[in-house]
Amino acid sequence: MGHESGHLRLTVRFAVAAALALAPNVAAAQAYQCRVPQGPVSVPAVPRDGPVRQVPVTGYTLALTWSPEYCRGREGRAADRRQCSGRAGRFGFVVHGLWPEGRGTWPQWCPAARAPTSRELAPNLCMTPSAALLAHEWTKHGACMVDAPGKYFKVSRILWNSLRWPDFDRIARADNLTAGQIRTAFAEANRHWEPEHVGLVVNERGWLKEMRLCYGRDFMPTACDRRRFGPPDSAPVKIWRGL
């Protein structure tokens, strides 16, 4: 127990140190005119969707969703109103979740001390514009990393705020765009990052859905394994810019 609690303390320290090393001089915004809600945020219940799996943490993945693609066809859905209606701002990449990784598998649904509070969720709704998703990610993934939801969201914000973004509107207009070009553009905008550190998820029609940034246990960038890397560099990829 002492060793595990020591690791929980080091998780936040490692993330802070890594973010200071990785932080760019200027970061392009990914949430345009986003407003954090002023009133209380409803804290939804989180049903478990898989088995408890407690394994040693060997690294992390910061999963980032490309909102224009996610919101295509979801603009009128109540569950996606904040992210997709435009009323709370316009979003580019947003944080899907910060996931601890294990050797050949990943930990999930570790016993959580408590659910997040409204006050813990609200400040993160420009990073992850869904209270339900924030609660889900803490319960499924975060509880396997740290001992309180506030710490999990803090580490996620530190990593998120350390990133610099190339102009994805310009990248999306490139002829014959490939996965390798997307990885290279991100790596060129972020010191210490290399293309092999950047995983991608595309749908069956070739549209970009997510970026998966791979970190070691020390929260420094590391090469993605095959499961997280996604399509080869030569694969054609399209990026939906929205209407």
Q: Model features per residue range: what roles?
A:
Residues 2-15:
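Bacterial N-terminal signal peptides that target proteins for export
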Residues 14, 56-58, 207-209:
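Residues at beta-strand starts and edge strands
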Residues 14, 18-20, 93-94:
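Localized chelating/binding microdomains
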Residues 23-26:
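N-terminal signal peptide c-region/cleavage motif recognized by signal peptidases
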Residues 30-73:
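N-terminal module-boundary/linker segments of secreted carbohydrate-active enzymes
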Residues 76-243:
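Domain-level detector of nuclease and nuclease-like folds
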Residues 1, 74:
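Short regulatory "switch" loops immediately downstream of catalytic or recognition motifs
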